[in-house]
Amino acid sequence: MNTILKVIWNAVFNLTGLDISMSARYDDWSFYLIELRANYPVIKGLLADRHLAPKEITPGETRLHIVGCEMRKVQVAGPYHEVSIQVPVEPLEEGPNGTFTHLYLPVNTEQSRWPGVDIWGFPKFIANIDIKMENNRLVCRLAAGDQLILEFKMNDKAGSWKHYKWDYYGIRKQQIVKTTMDPEGFISDEGFDESASLVLGAHPVADTLREILLTEEVVRTIIGHKVSSILKKPVRIKMSYN
């Protein structure tokens, strides 16, 4: 069914320009986010071709988020894992939500990769993603085959009921598109967590992260359990990407 949808969606979009997709329901998932200090000029250069600019937190500094996600029940795509490597960006339109774009968005199934790329314009690729508890600590490992890209660890925490709204910019068919995700669930957002750590491997993605990061020290963590959300149908921003 997923493959049939891929063929139909691409045929209609390529022939007519009509997006026949719908918003996607995420009925049950967990996420583990670490935040790190990042080099504003370097990320600004990486995003220049997208016509996006990182949000400057302090002079010369922005943030990088690495988010391990266990997607257990997702409409159409089914269960999968992903690791979002994302940065906050300046909004192209005024709005109340935090605004981000993905530098990389590896996933571990083709059923979750193609709609992310074709419909939402996300930079998804297939990778090995292992998220598990080990000695009472959460471990998220991202690899390409046997080659480590990154691994981060943190203490798991039970949170209280919270609701967020995050906007994301993607690039689809040489156009900027925006979508909104509205996670709600038991979320712990307590700021600095000295238990969290990051290790980078020997891979081109890891090399890029080394250039981006000012330090590998984690400055903030957010953990979400029993989360549900809707990933809104993308809308095209009224500016040319050419």
State each model region's role.
Residues 1-76, 80, 209-214, 219-222, ...:
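N-terminal domain-onset segments
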Residues 3, 10-15, 118-242:
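Interaction-surface and assembly-scaffold signal
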Residues 10, 39, 109-110, 203:
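Alpha-helix initiation/capping motif
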Residues 35-38, 89, 202:
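Short beta-strand-to-loop capping motifs
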Residues 69-150:
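Aromatic- and glycine-enriched beta-alpha-beta binding-site module
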